[in-house]
Amino acid sequence: MQKYTNLYDVLIIGAGPAGSNAAISYKKLNPTLKVGLIDKAVFPRDKSCGDAIGPGVISALKRFNNEHILENEPQVVSTTLYGPENIGIQNYIPEVKNKEDSIVYVIPRIDLDNRILNLAKDLEVDVFEGYSFVSFEEDIDKKLVVEIKNDNHNLKFGTKILIGADGANSRVRKQLNVKKNSDWHKAIAIRAYIDSPNYLEIFKERSLMFEINVSAEKGYAWAFPSKGNLLNIGIGVPLSIFKKEKLDINELLQDFIEQLEKRGVVVENVRDEKSYLLPFASSRPKITQKVNVTLIGDASSMINPMSGEGIFYGMEAGYLLAKNTHNLLDSPDLNKGIGSYEKAFSKRFKRHYLSCALARLVLQSPFMTKRLLKVASNDQDTIDFVVELLFDEAYLT
């Protein structure tokens, strides 16, 4: 086997929030580690997403005093939920049980991801932008040899642990022979940006708007206000329903834009429409191989099945992985440390994910959506719980 040019303690494929936070966590827990971070894109780069980050992401940033990257961003103060027959509820974001802050920001991923990556660069993480993952194989001494490439070069690096944080279509996951989620455990969504000079006037404040079972039956649409007049809008539906009913994602987005206009929202300059897949955490992969390779973030199907949010879970996974393995990188027990990370993540989020999956089933029924919103309109605890499923780690008891 051809030898590698550099040996890393940790090599991470994918420099989104999950991968970058994993790199940050390893360096903060042990600054002497040699950490490499690889991404096929050159940053800053766009990423299709709703762009909303809540208390979980803020808490993950605060762990290592990195919350300063959120300075000067406007805070979202409420949520507005619409259901069938125009049932609507507006509610201030409640104090969540597990976090210091009950705050939401809407920051385009082209900015947010670049800021988090720069935090990793500041810690002297070696970053390789514009390089794609090719393959890995185990060397005779149990180290991993990882090949990456760009248009001009093929490079081989050695590493003690390889982390796949390379998204819903993870190449690392594919080489591990871990199947993709079935259509039942995935959604398809489309995001666009618009300008709206009167959105804050219509909703009286900076509010996240969710529309359930209106523009997309058995799915939901969103409008999230960012800086100035900028809004992130989009719509998502379960992939199984999307295929069965032969829906058109662009038509669904247009239907939602028309709904916004019916509510009085001025919609201007629709742009940057981009569709994407969301692998839900209702079907998380089990890695049975004994090589020191693991997955985090979308590559490991960590997306909330109710909200479609994945940034927080991916960032926490990166931290938990570093916490459970940073002191085992030269130990024969490294693989046990990877197993400890999986157990820790599952213990923390399993009941939450199950509760969100059940909520998803309820919200796929227009009848049940109407009932839930009617109850919530008269019961503060119910609406608070729904919001905590979206933004915290709440679960049914």
Which residues fall in each region the model found?
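Predominantly flavin-linked oxidoreductase catalytic cores and closely associated redox partners
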Residues: 119-263
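Short beta-strand to alpha-helix junction loop
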Residues: 52, 96-118, 192, 242-248
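Glycine-rich FAD pyrophosphate-binding loop
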Residues: 11, 25-49
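FAD/FMN-dependent oxidoreductases across multiple families
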Residues: 241-324
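Beta1/beta-strand and adjacent pyrophosphate-binding region of the FAD-binding site
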Residues: 2-18, 36
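Conserved N-terminal glycine-rich FAD pyrophosphate-binding loop of Rossmann-like flavoproteins
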Residues: 41-64
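C-terminal helical "tail/cap" subdomain of flavin- and related membrane-associated enzymes
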Residues: 323-397
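A conserved beta-strand/loop capping segment in the N-terminal third of enzymes
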Residues: 31, 58, 62-114
